[in-house]
Amino acid sequence: MTSEGFFERVYEVVEQIPEGMVATYGQVALLAGRPRSARYVGYALHSNPRPGQIPCHRVVFADGRICEGFAFGGPDAQRELLMGEGVTFADPMHVDLGACRWPAGL
């Protein structure tokens, strides 16, 4: 699979994450067919060609942490988008994965 093909598969997976839920970079990598490529998921999302359509704000680190380098407005923007969808937070930088993790691939 080329990196371009992988990026498109990442976008397809992320488009399936329901509003009010989150997935981890590793989870998206697994579902996109490259289970050890969480970092490349980050690269793909940073290059998101359709930010209004591909909800990259719904992808977080394995510990629930939101991305300090969120490409579309920083962590405050990511937090605001997630909270607007009803995602609960354990603290200002970590979503409550127990309450809002998308179960696909687990």
Where are the regions a protein language model picked out?
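Nucleic acid-binding interface residues in structured DNA/RNA-binding domains
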Residues: 1-106
